[in-house]
Amino acid sequence: MKFYKYCASGNDFVITNADRKEDRSALAKELCNRYEGIGADGFIVILPHEKYDFEWEFYNNDGSRAAMCGNGSRAAAHFAHHINKINPNMSFLTGAGVIKAKVNQDKVEVSLGKIKSVQNTFEELGKTWQLCNTGVPHLVHFCQNLDEFDTMLCQKMRQKYNANVNFVKILDENHLKVRTYERGVEDETLACGTGMGACFYLAFLNKKVQNKVKITPKSGEEVGFAYKNEELFFEGKVKYCFEANYNFS
């Protein structure tokens, strides 16, 4: 199987083309294994579609399916344009709906669409939380010190609410820093696009930031978010790493 390795804002992905849908959960788990496979946060399968430029199947590191992945969507768009020669202005189908993307060399902007849902704040484990769905569910906690991030606490919240868990610090009205515990990876990752989007949207909703901000995830690779016309936009660099053939075990 020919595959392509991509990185976006600290998340890494294995991407391949296929001509039909099928359950690739076991394959995803094998490929994403960092010791016995290629190693990645997620596995993306690009499929043909009659109406849109393409459709994807997205698998988490543990082989589970996910409706959406922000950084994965940017990597998929970069791949579709640079490898599959699709128009730089494209739309593709995900489990969370249609994603629009614009590719400009190594920069990719995607529209994550309208926010699916926001719930009221609540207190648990000594912290204030709010749940926001940006294609997948995210718990968000605003803090003064990101060293408060606790993997064990995040694990408890993730298991109880079946959601990703984010800690966010507001540096000023134009800049946030975020750390994320990702469902499906079951650990902190270097970045999470939909998680950063949830943090930005809740900060904007609570009038703590402007409608356009920079966000720095754990990777240190700064990305941009904007909210306009009731849609969430996400832009940053994407890196093509390498391509190779994989022999199945």
Swiss-Prot record:
Location in the cell reads: Cytoplasm
Per the UniProt record, the site (Could be important to modulate the pK values of the two catalytic cysteine residues) maps to: 138, 182
Q: Which reaction does it catalyse?
A: (2S,6S)-2,6-diaminopimelate = meso-2,6-diaminopimelate
Gene Ontology annotations of biological process type: lysine biosynthetic process via diaminopimelate
What residues does substrate bind to? 11, 60, 70-71, 164, 182-183, 193-194
Swiss-Prot/TrEMBL keywords: Amino-acid biosynthesis, Cytoplasm, Isomerase, Lysine biosynthesis
Its top-level enzyme class, in one word, is isomerase
Q: E.C. number, please? A: 5.1.1.7
Cite a GO CC annotation: cytosol
Query: What pathway does the UniProt record associate with this protein?
Result: Amino-acid biosynthesis; L-lysine biosynthesis via DAP pathway; DL-2,6-diaminopimelate from LL-2,6-diaminopimelate: step 1/1
| Gene Ontology terms, MF aspect | diaminopimelate epimerase activity
> Which residues are catalytic?
69 (proton donor), 192 (proton acceptor)
What quaternary structure, including any partners, is listed in this protein's UniProt entry? Homodimer.
Q: Which family does it belong to?
A: Belongs to the diaminopimelate epimerase family.
Q: What NCBIfam families is this protein classified in?
A: DapF
Function description: Catalyzes the stereoinversion of LL-2,6-diaminopimelate (L,L-DAP) to meso-diaminopimelate (meso-DAP), a precursor of L-lysine and an essential component of the bacterial peptidoglycan.
PANTHER family cross-referenced by the UniProt entry: DIAMINOPIMELATE EPIMERASE, DIAMINOPIMELATE EPIMERASE, CHLOROPLASTIC
Under what name is this protein listed?
A: Diaminopimelate epimerase
Its taxonomic path starts at:
Bacteria, Pseudomonadati, Campylobacterota, Epsilonproteobacteria, Campylobacterales
